[in-house]
Every structure is written in structure tokens, then in C-alpha cells.
Amino acid sequence: MPLALLALAVGAFGIGTTEFVMMGLLPDVADDLGISLPAAGHLVSAYALGVVIGAPLLAAATARMSRRTVLISLMVLFVAGNALSALAPGNDSLLAARFLSGLPHGAFFGVGAVVATNMVAPERKARSVSLMFLGLTVANIAGVPVATLMGQRLGWRATFLGVSVIGLVAIASLALLIPRDRAAAPTTGLRGELAALRSLPVWLALGTTVAGFGALFSAYSYITPMLTDAAGYADSSVTLLLALFGVGATIGNLLGGRLADHAMRPTLFGGLASLVAVLALFPLLMTTVWGGALAVLLLGVAAFVTGSPLTMTVMEKAAAGPSLASSANQAAFNLANAGGAWTGGLALAAGFGVTSPASAGAVLAALGLGVAGVAYAVDRRRESARAGHVVAAHTPERPGVLHR
């Protein structure tokens, strides 16, 4: 694999760290700024809002720019957002800085996926995407715990300064390792990128992302009370178990990339089906300490097996405008985050028990499997129609019959 993929992984590591570290620093931020914990929670929402808005907006705005230049520019914006977060004097300015930090997130992964797949042979495209996302999953194992510990020991502002340094390393790596684009811009331009989003298969793929990863976040958003109240873990053990989730996500990400290069659609269907099964088993697994640990590990594997196939599916269905479509897929991931957490919260509020968010997630995963099935049926129908047109076009005319 090209060494340039390392530069994309470094950027992904920084983005993954800043996205998730705020959840562990909320009490420290709330105390320092003199705000309530729910008010501090809006800092997580501000970042997610930046991702959803920035993913399609920045991808569209930079459609005619060199992709290498776009990636470097996005990381400059990322560094600026995190540096401003570290220097924010109050809650309002921190909200704005977190929103700014989220803006480049989706566009970086969207454009990065296109760059990654263009650097490898066709049979290694999914693996190249999974290697870029490796930075994101490793961030959950090492980046987030270390950054959280740094924030607790040195103050939360030190964490964002540290993330800014990671961003600077990513900028240097991108400048050194990503090949220069010979063409000044993608051939399709903005019009072609936007036209690609009019395709029904693209929207079905995005719908699969929202439902499938909504299933993950329905359970993951409430994983702490499941581990403490159901499985019997102490609060101090949760951080280690979340790192175990990162291990599972890393395994699933690499496995999904390798399998998808051989059979993309079966990998997607298999991943979603396994996610349904894992989430359905949560009420049983969360009755013991070892079962709880196994549930967390399997959740990471099952969810992230689908990551590369989903990204590749969106890019293939939007071949005329892969950058914008891939960035829109990142926005779909964050919609899944918000929608999944909301769905899991409804199950909890209804009094169905502490593991009910996982059961709700199983329903969402089944919905994602259904949407993927509809997408498959649409593809088959279109392929049959095209085959029929080809046969008709190549069928010679029969000579007229002579009547006596």
C-alpha cells in the first residue's frame, strides 16, 4: 500500500481524537466555564452540526480544486478550530470553535477516500479506504484515552492544543506524501458532483448508512449505564472497556476492507446481519462481566465491518461525483449518531430497561439491512433493463416473409 495512506490516517487520527474526546472532558469543561453539564453537552452537538453542514458544503465548494490542496486546506481549518477551542474565553466562543472544528471532518474523509482509492489497483480500493479509517479507530484505542487523561491532569485546554499539534503533523505528512494532482481539478466539477446526488441508488446507500450506524449509536450512546447497571462494572472500568470497543472497531474496519475487495455486497449484508445479531444478544450478554466485555468488542467489529463497503458503495453509485457523495456519506454518519442516540433514549424513557437501546438498535440495523436489500433489487432491475436494451440493439432484423 502507498505510504501516502499514512498521511490520511494521521489526519483521521486527529479528527477521531477531537470528535470523541469532548465526551470525556465535559465535567472539566463545565466546571471551568461555570455551566451545567447539559449545557456543556451542546459542545458535542456543535461539532456534529459542523460535520453535517461542512461535509457537503466544503466538498461542493472545493470541487474544482486540486484534491491534495483541498486536504491540506481542510487540515489547516481543523488546526484553527482546535487552537481556537483551546483559547476560547467562554462557552459561546467554545461552541463556535467546536462548530468550526467539525466543518472539515466530513469533507476530509470524503475527499480522502477518493484520493486513497485513486492510488491503488481496483482490487485494493476498499482496503485503501479501511487504512485511512484506521486512524479513526486507533484514535478510540489510544488517542481519546490519552487526550482525556491529558485534559484531566493539565486542563482541558491542553487537550485541544495537543490535537492542534497532531493536525500540524498531518499537514506536513499530506504535503510530503500525497502526490500532486496533475489536473487542476476533477473533470466533473461542481455540476457533475451535484448531478451524482440525484441518483436513487446513492440515496439508498446513504439511507443504509443512517440506519446501520444509527443502530450502533443507539447502543453505544448508552453503553456506560449498560456496563455499570447491567453487567456490574465499576465506573472506573468503563474507559478500559471503551478502548476494547476501539480494538473491535479496528478489527472490523480492517476485516471489512479486505472482504469488500473480494465481495463488497455480501460483506455489507453480512456486516449488517451480524450487527442485528449482536445487538439482539445484548440483553443476554450484559448479565455478566465477561459477557459485557464480549458485547462491547463484538459491537465494534460488527459495526465497522460495514464502514468500507458503505463508503465504496456510495462512491461507485456516484462515480461522476465521488467527492461530494463520499462527503455526504460522512454527514450521514453524523445524522446516524444523533438519530441513533435519540432512538435509544426513547427506548430508555419508555421504561423498557437499561439494555433497551441495544434492542432498538437491532431494529435499526434490520431496517438498514432492508434498505440495502431494496438497493440490491433496484440495481438488479436496472441491470436487467440495460441488458435488455443491449440485446435488442444487437438483434438482427428478420427478413420479411414472402406471401404467395
Regions found by a protein language model. Give the residues of each.
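Conserved MFS/SLC helix-loop-helix module at the cytosolic interface between two early adjacent transmembrane helices
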Residues: 53-92
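Helix-breaking motifs and short loop linkers at transmembrane-helix boundaries and internal kinks
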Residues: 34, 66, 87-93, 232, ...
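Cytoplasmic helix-loop-helix junction between adjacent transmembrane helices
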Residues: 97-136
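C-terminal membrane-cytosol helix-exit motif in multi-pass small-molecule transporters
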Residues: 164-184, 371-375
